[in-house]
Amino acid sequence: MLLPALRAVQDACIPHAVFTHTFRGYINGLHRLGAGTVSRLYGYHVTTIWDSADLNIVATLPRLDPASRRPQPDNLRWVGPIIAAPARPQREDPPLVLVSMSTNGFRGQRRTVERTINALATLPLRAIVTTAGVLNPDDLPKALNVDVVGYVDHGELMPRCSLVVGHGGHSSSFRALAHDLPLLVIPASPLSDQRMIGASIAAARAGLSLRRSASTETIRRAITTLLTTPQYRSAATQIGAEVRASDATGQAARLITGLT
């Protein structure tokens, strides 16, 4: 957030831009009530500082961001998610499911991953679970059709996948959508942007969102529904086309150079 630096830049009347890496609806809502409350104790009002910048670049799709349906400051520009260009899809049969939860190790994350593995174990598919060092793969349940690993390049896996099960992080969720993949979102933290992202994806019919406490059977039913109902893939494909066409980095660069 660099609030002291932004305050100093504004006091010096130096042209500057701020970057919103997730939904504006979250930054101006729940985040303002969480981290924003702490910032106010030090005399920094996040919304005021953000809205006073010459430019606020929001790196997400406006139609999924709840804030796009409300009036916004004149400095705000949506450019789309900044995502590396996806490789050509090579879907596997039986379908391959990628499970990727947060790298922050939120409370209860192990139980969510365990229930997800148990849900996948009885389905006619293959799955790869990446733990990113947060959990030890050897400590998780074993299943013949599920590989549990530490680190794997998701950019290599996603073209082969038919579904992603994740925690609702903005980057990983939109990376999946850029590959035309529907999502099962199981938010790891009620204070993060994850619930809002999961709800928006579900509302767009590009996936489903469950509570962190969802049972193994509930997760199993959701995975089955997403793999067997074409409308979810269709909606994800439409969003994926929008992400790939957005030229987010180019738009952001042109906006920034326009400040000079």
Model-assigned labels for residue ranges:
Residues 1-126, 140:
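Nucleotide-sugar-dependent glycosyltransferase catalytic domains
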Residues 12, 217-260:
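C-terminal amphipathic helix plus adjacent low-complexity
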Residues 20-21, 168, 185-189, 209-213:
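Short beta->alpha connector loops at strand-helix junctions that form conserved
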Residues 54, 76, 145-147, 207:
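Short, conserved active-site loop motifs that form the nucleotide-linked donor/cofactor pocket
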Residues 124, 134-152:
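Nucleotide-activated donor-binding/catalytic signature segment of Leloir-type glycosyltransferases, i.e.
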Residues 151-198:
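A donor-sugar binding/catalytic signature common to diverse glycosyltransferases
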